Curated annotation (Swiss-Prot):
NCBIfam families: PRK02101.1-1, PRK02101.1-3. GO terms for cellular component: cytosol. It comes from Chromohalobacter salexigens (strain ATCC BAA-138 / DSM 3043 / CIP 106854 / NCIMB 13768 / 1H11). HAMAP family: UPF0246. Pfam families: H2O2_YaaD. This is UPF0246 protein Csal_3046. The lineage of its organism: Bacteria, Pseudomonadati, Pseudomonadota, Gammaproteobacteria, Oceanospirillales. GO terms for biological process: response to hydroperoxide. Belongs to the UPF0246 family.
Length: 262
């Protein structure tokens, strides 16, 4: 059983990683192809393409200009510790043991607009390129056209190699659209996290994102490898809600009284 998550816009390349183990991304050749396209964009055009401020556009133009393999611990960082944000706050990969890192390499993947599909310890250099970006390339008009075929095949293989043919989709809709779900050769379970608010269970973005990371970490640390085990997720006050779940869209809910203590 394997889980897949989205990357994060916020990056941390200042803090040293808590593991000396690292691997190389498997799609560096394709990443380099995208970098060459992006280098032709001025900061102003990047701002328009990516919908970001002039300051951020300038920063990312510089990142694209400086991007250079080969990757090493001196110029790159393992993806799972470079990404920050709500999901990664919940994941807290810096607290993983080496045994946890080994499991994560087999059981967790990170979708990326620039790197395609990352294992947790794959080295990355700083970038910003969301999967929904309409960056024209040889394969089509956007990054979905560029990545979908190879990522679908690669993710299917990774799920098979994990031992249990089940994919736990903890990615955002924007990123999971990079996968042709109909062609996956496995069962796909999509957890949804809802918090009680004024007597009703609703998706609260910050809590839901953090919960995706919490579930990913729990699956790794507890060595979860069956769907039945997944229903036992009980971190931070969440519990499986059979009444709200439908098919393989599994809803986990949390009472308002449990939020403060989480």
């Amino acid at each position: 059983m394997l889980s897949v998550i989205s990357p994060a816009k916020t990056l941390d390349f200042e803090t040293s990683p808590t593991t000396a183990t690292y691997t190389q991304p498997q799609y560096l050749e394709q990443s380099a192809e995208l970098i060459e396209i992006l280098r032709d964009y001025s900061p102003q055009r990047l701002s328009e393409l990516m919908g970001i401020s002039d300051k951020l556009a300038g920063l990312n133009a510089a990142r694209f200009a400086e991007w250079a393999p080969p990757f090493s611990p001196e110029n790159a960082k393992p993806a799972v510790q470079a990404f920050q944000g709500d999901v990664y706050q919940g994941l807290d990969a810096a607290a993983f043991s080496e045994a946890d890192n080994e499991v994560a390499q087999r059981r967790l993947r990170i979708l990326s607009g620039l790197y395609g599909l990352l294992r947790p310890l794959d080295l990355i250099q700083p970038y910003r390129l969301e999967m929904g970006t309409k960056l024209a390339n040889r394969a089509g008009k956007d990054l979905y056209a560029f990545w979908r075929e190879r990522l679908t095949q690669d993710l299917s293989r990774a799920v098979e190699d994990s031992g249990t043919p089940v994919l736990v989709n903890l990615a955002s809709n924007e990123y999971f659209k990079a996968i042709d779900a109909k062609r996956l050769t496995c069962r796909v379970i999509t957890p949804v996290f809802k918090d009680e608010k004024n007597g009703q269970f609703k998706i609260v973005s910050f809590y839901a994102k953090k919960a995706r990371g919490l579930m990913s970490a729990w699956m790794i640390k507890e060595r979860i490898d069956t769907p039945d085990d997944l229903k036992g997720f009980d971190v931070a006050g969440y519990a499986f809600n059979a009444g709200l779940s439908e098919g393989d869209t599994w809803v986990f809910t949390r009472r308002e009284s449990d939020v403060a203590g989480a």
